[in-house]
Design a protein with these regions (language model features):
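Basic, low-complexity intrinsically disordered segments
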Residues: 1-187
């Protein structure tokens, strides 16, 4: 499968390593190759602030689990859905969503309530990564990236770190999924 479906030795070796680390079946491997995981994860030009906000080696581990772009081809018309409809579709397809994120993710909840002061806020999707020992907040936007979205995500990360994270957990990671981005604005 690897020899037939991969373009070069480096890609072949990367998928081999992923199979060993994640225990992928041949079906999962075939899906990951077809979705271009190598190009989206290993070679992607990712827009994150992990290197400036997180200590090594945690920043490198957090960077490794990110992809650009995420592929939600298992959801019909994903690009045309409103946020709540996209959220509904992702929750219905949670197994495939976890497969897209990678190994080690556990689903904690949708519209996860978190109390900050006297107010209650709702995180679109909350996960826990058992390999990285950290919470993983997903904020969904069905429009182009706007700077205020990063502020809201940062607020959620601080709230989760303050309310849910245990002393043995690593800092919370956030993923802001937008319809698109102006790379300069997003950075």
């Amino acid at each position: 499968l690897l020899i037939d479906k991969t373009d070069n030795l480096e890609e072949h070796m990367w998928y081999t390593q992923q199979c060993l680390e994640n225990g992928w079946s041949s079906t999962v491997l075939a899906h990951q190759i077809e979705s271009g995981l190598y190009y989206r994860q290993a070679l992607a030009d990712k827009t994150t602030n992990f290197k400036t906000r997180l200590a090594n080696p945690f920043s490198e581990q957090a960077e490794e689990i990110m992809k650009d772009p995420y592929i939600f081809d298992f959801i019909p018309n994903a690009k045309k859905l409103r946020e709540i409809e996209l959220e509904d579709a992702l929750v219905q397809q949670i197994t495939k969503l976890l497969l897209e994120f990678g190994s080690g993710f556990a689903f904690m909840g949708r519209q996860y309530p978190i109390q900050v002061g006297k107010r209650e806020f709702f995180i679109d999707l909350l996960f826990y990564n058992v390999k990285l020992h950290c919470y993983f907040v997903v904020e969904l936007k069905t429009v182009e990236f706007e700077p205020e979205f990063a502020g809201k995500l940062s607020f959620y990360l601080s709230a989760v770190d303050g309310e849910l994270k245990s002393p043995s957990d690593n800092p919370t990671i956030g993923l802001l999924l937008c319809k698109g981005k102006d790379k300069m604005v997003a950075e």
